[in-house]
Amino acid sequence: MASLQQGEKQLFEKFWKGTFKAVATPRPESIIVASITARKPMPRTEPQSSLLLPDQDGPSEKLGQHLAPEALGTNSWGREKACRELDPARAHSASQDRDPTPPPSSRGKKKKKKSTRKKRRRSPSYSPSPVKKKKKKSSKKHKRHRSFSKKRRHSSCSPKSKRREEKRHKKQSRSRKSHRHRHHRCPSRSQSSELRSPSCESRHRGRSPEEGRKSRRTHSRRCSKNHCKVSPDARSSHLPSQPLPRLGFLSARGVITGSGSAADLFSKSASPLAATRGRSQEYDSGNDTSSPPSTQTSSARSRGQEKGSPGGDLSKSRDLNCGNTSDSGNSFTTSSPQNKGAVLETVSPACRSRESRGFQSPCLQCAEVKKSSLVPSTARSSPIKECSRSSSYTSTRSSSPSSRSPNPRASPRYTRSRSTSSEKRSYSRSPSYSSKSGKRSPPSRSSRSRRSPSYSRYSPSRERDLKYGEKEPQPRERARRRRRSYSPMRKRRRDSPSHLEARRITSARKRPIPYYRPSPSSSSSLSSASSWYSSSSSSSSSSSRSPSRSYSRSRSPSRSHSSRSQTRSRTRTSRSSSSRSLSLGSRSRSRNRSLSYSSAESYASTRR
């Protein structure tokens, strides 16, 4: 045992010698002995005894030796250093003689010297080596903890703070965008609202359908051009309501190829819808979110409800859509009728004409009618799908086309692709939409994907697209802008009780939308649409899809759609896409939004 221990000890000594030669060449056993003596006289004596009497204290010797090597390994460096610094002679004598007294003296001196170190280290341990141990551990731990905690704090805080900052930036940017849009559109919007409440009626009522159709056709042609172009994506996003209706005209005229499936859908119901659009879309493009369109929507809705058939549903959804933002809704309504047109070409056009007229005439009254109509419509329209769709389209203009379409019930997604854009979006967004109407589906898909991308984030671009791309028709553009931003609605909402709910929804939707926004293009967009749509619904009138997007969304809906449409599917109107995703997304939300929207819409009507 003793020999084994001695061999181990020698190995340790060699190791430590080699290690500390650089520091200070110690005598052969000075390090080990000094450390052992300084730390534990007993282990030191025991090793001695082990050397002298290996058989007597094997276990204790072993213990002592093990302790000594341990002490050596851990503290031999510090002790050796201290010993040398304090009293090399004493350390040497202690190591050679291994007298209990010298080591204590060296130990005391060490203590004295290391007591300062101890204090510095704040380690309560008596011996320097324990101090060192503790210090090392504690310092490491503290450092680690500090760094980790800092890292954790930073990481945890940074994501949160980043998120918060992002949210703030988003809010700020949105508010800025909305302000910008308001400023950009404000003239157009205030004019739009003027145009729409008065001009809505004047447009829809005052403007002869032919006039509206002519302007629409011109705009449609522009829009169809835009649609064909990439900018049309953005524009179609703004144009979701207008270009789609226009596309309907164009598609009726053979723009189908240019506008795609959406155009096809339009072409299907385009000729009948053209007339309705002449009005409904006119007020759609011009009226976008004005409550007059909403009111018109309600009247159309009541009519559609009276009809009860796909036409009825269409009018319902259309009413909701119109009511919702009436701008997109109506535009999409036309689209939807067109979309529906594919499904309900006959009923949808007739209904639409009627609905358009109905929408157009009951501007303010309809706001309330739409309100009452909106909720019942949501409930009435195919209970779940219609609700989701009705609500959806209520909340989102594009939604309305789907809801409006006889097939809206068929699929909330279909609701999403309520307009041409809607169709495209629905198509991409929801199989049901595709199944509803193959033609429609493809447009839906485009629209949807488009809308989804530009829905909220790109709302500014969409609005700009609307603004710059579609400035040609000033009244319409203004109406469209207003409908997009629904700035009056938005402003009202902020002041109005409905605004409270809408805003809450907005914040709620705001969070999901960023994640879901891309989703609308795919069927998964249903869920995204749900959350997004529900929030949108709350802003219902302002931005069917960006209703709640009150910030810039309300006016930026088209923009955001347009951006999205650019990103996703430049062919479709992002706006209807966005709306669509919204509409499908949340039936309950859409209902809530419908209510909230109704109140907002009536607010808008009253204000207008």
UniProtKB/Swiss-Prot annotation:
Tissue specificity note: Specifically expressed in neuronal cells (at protein level). Expressed in adult nervous system and sensory organ tissues.
Biased composition (Basic residues): 107-123, 131-187, 214-228, 478-494, 556-573
Keyword Membrane: no
Comp. bias regions, Low complexity: 188-200, 289-299, 389-420, 428-459, 518-555, 574-608
Changes seen on gene knockout: About 85% of the mutant mice die in the first few hours after birth and few surviving animals display balance defects and exhibit persistent tremors. Mice show impaired development of the central and peripheral nervous systems in part by disrupting neurite outgrowth, cortical layering in the forebrain, and axon guidance in the corpus callosum.
Subcellular localization: Nucleus
The keyword Phosphoprotein belongs to this UniProt entry's keyword annotation: yes
GO molecular function: identical protein binding; mRNA binding
A biological process from GO: RNA splicing
GO cellular component: nucleus
Region of interest called Disordered, as start-end residue ranges on this chain: 34-246, 261-608
Database matches in InterPro entries: SRRM_C, SRRM_Domain-Containing
Alphabetical UniProt keywords: Differentiation, mRNA processing, mRNA splicing, Nucleus, Phosphoprotein, RNA-binding
Mod. after translation: Phosphorylated.
Composition bias, Basic and acidic residues: 78-100, 201-213, 460-477, 495-504
Comp. bias intervals (Polar residues): 322-339
Main location: nucleus
Physiological role: Splicing factor specifically required for neural cell differentiation. Acts in conjunction with nPTB/PTBP2 by binding directly to its regulated target transcripts and promotes neural-specific exon inclusion in many genes that function in neural cell differentiation. Required to promote the inclusion of neural-specific exon 10 in nPTB/PTBP2, leading to increased expression of neural-specific nPTB/PTBP2. Also promotes the inclusion of exon 16 in DAAM1 in neuron extracts.
Similarity comment: Belongs to the nSR100 family.
Protein name: Serine/arginine repetitive matrix protein 4
Organism: Mus musculus
